[in-house]
Amino acid sequence: MASKKLKYKTDFDKCVLTDNFAARGWTRCGDKDDDDWNIYWATVWNVRNIFNPKSGIRLNDMQIINHFPNHYELTRKDLMVKNFKRYKKELEKENSPYCQKDENGNYLYLDFIPQTFTLPGEYSLFVEEFHRNPNATWIVKPASRSQGKGIFLLRKIQQLKKIGGGTNSNPLQAFSLKEAYVVSRYIDNPLLVGGRKFDLRIYALVTSYRPLKVYLYAMGFGRFCNEQYTQDIAEMDNMFIHLTNVAIQKFSDKYSEKHGGKWSLQSLRYYLEMVYGTDMANKCFDDINNIIIMSLKSVQSIIINDKHCFEMYGYDILIDENCKPWLIEINASPSLTVTGKIDKELKTELIKNVYQIVIPDDWNDDSSKTGANTSTQTKVGDFNILYDEAQEKKISQQQQQQKKNINSKTIWK
């Protein structure tokens, strides 16, 4: 263990955080204004304040914090879409191999976000697409809210009056610019288990953006709706059918406190193997890995890569009936509230592993080990390295050198 007891600060009184701090013998800062901490698990608002140049706060080499300064470039729904569209154009311009398409003209590696428009900026584009597919269902979400708040399904343009006022001819005429929205093509053919819709919550830990280094947690889970899935228009407003958020589902009469409407990721993978076969299940999870890497790369150049920062993202992935995964959203502050014994065990181990990566046991013994990206391990608990750009470049350089040596031997034999 570290030779000196470390101090922590947290804005969240969640047992999975505080119990893990206590287990490592760390001391909690007693006052909310106490800045003598080594690790701070903060709200996104306090992180923004800390990195605001006007705050006058300067973190020292022995301080790390759980968000990058402009994390919202990835975790705000509208900015996530905007940044990925920009990144896709950059790859196309470079004629990147990631832009390969199948025989139907669909991207092999970049087609994982449902068609999405931002409102009010892309309202006209949305209307054009809406009229091209008049029978499609769309889902409308506030860009910066979470836990399913403010979400509704849409089949008629006039339904946008819910968020913008306006008239039937122009529902966004009086749209408030105080809050942005996204409207996405609703995935109306989700894979069902027992007739119910579900999505996956998968955790990814980023310790550096340049070079990109990301760990993937093996023990995610599926979140289930409590009601049987249907496309019946009469049930469009029934969020117990359409939204998997626990914050929504816990109000259903069918909600179980025992399991919290969750299945382990391993159980869901076994289910996929049983229904689709091992090869398709493996491809599905390979595609999920690709989604995580490509989404992070889409903001790699614009995230402020402060060495004091790390970020644990909660990815929400929906699998359709063709075993194709779709990225629904990325959460900067995935819920650490526990919904039962198994959920508590999973999240306790999750946070324990995060601490082991960002502050390894020798972190305080070695003055050269500062910042959140000091661990050299490829596996820590249930976290495994998903992508290590520095290592990838090193291997690439070694392969290029080997190729040069081979060429030299061929020429000078």
From Swiss-Prot:
Binding residues for ATP: S184, R185, Y186, I187, K197, D199
UniProt cross-references to SUPFAM superfamilies, sorted A to Z: Glutathione synthetase ATP-binding domain-like (SSF56059)
Lineage: superkingdom: Eukaryota
One Pfam family named in its UniProt record: TTL
Major place of residence: cytoplasm
Domain (TTL) ranges: 2-370
GO biological process entries: microtubule cytoskeleton organization; protein polyglutamylation
Location(s), subcellular: Cytoplasm, Cytoskeleton; Cytoplasm, Cytoskeleton, Cilium basal body; Contractile vacuole
GO CC annotations on file: ciliary basal body; contractile vacuole; microtubule
InterPro entries in UniProt: TTL/TTLL_fam
Keywords in alphabetical order: ATP-binding, Cell projection, Cilium, Cytoplasm, Cytoskeleton, Ligase, Microtubule, Nucleotide-binding, Vacuole
UniProt similarity note: Belongs to the tubulin polyglutamylase family.
Entry function: Probable tubulin polyglutamylase with a strong preference for alpha-tubulin. Modifies alpha-tubulin, generating side chains of glutamate on the gamma-carboxyl groups of specific glutamate residues within the C-terminal tail of alpha-tubulin.
Stated name of the protein: Probable alpha-tubulin polyglutamylase Ttll1
Lineage, broadest ranks: Eukaryota, Sar, Alveolata, Ciliophora, Intramacronucleata
